[in-house]
């Protein structure tokens, strides 16, 4: 968007909500939802448009946070998406896996280290983010985040925006991203599985061998 209209016209924002798509729409718990973050990319942070949005949200029941470091906050959300959405999507289990499996925790931590290394190289200070940004909205152990919901429903995922972006930035900065590279290809393979690429029946059940 910034490339088309110039970033000076943009009030940067994102939302942290754990929602689930059902037949009648998206469902989420408003009480446990962290909410909407927004803010100016540079001073003045308490701009007129920030105050205007603040006034709009007043008395709506929404949760929101105005931040002076929206860039770091956006990276904090990106880190959560990469580290928590993706490993559970590969395994096909609820988010409780990160507490119950040292192996899932190790994969998550490996992805996190790569995100933090790229952020540091870009001059993003993740220590500046709000305390609530270090975690997602409270959910049950059985919760399935958006990437796994996409796979469950046979939809293509946002993996290009997550590990795909990490691979691209890592290459530009000379930072290895092996966890993200493996994760990227695994999610892409799961998309192919949903697309029927691996349905070996009839004439498609050809002879093959290991290489």
Regions found by a protein language model. Give the residues of each.
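Broad structural signal for hydrophobic residues in well-ordered alpha-helices, predominantly aliphatic
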Residues: 1-2, 87, 169
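Short, hinge-like loop/turn segments at secondary-structure boundaries
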Residues: 27-31, 82-84, 196-197
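NAD(P)-dependent Rossmann-like dehydrogenase/reductase catalytic/cofactor-binding core
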Residues: 58, 97, 105-211
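Active-site-proximal catalytic alpha-helix in oxidoreductases
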Residues: 71-99, 103-116, 140-142
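Helix-loop-beta segment of a Rossmann-like dinucleotide-binding subdomain
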Residues: 27-40, 91-100, 144-153
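Rossmann-fold dinucleotide-binding core
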Residues: 1-73, 77
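Short coil/loop linkers at secondary-structure junctions
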Residues: 6-8, 63, 94, 125-127, ...
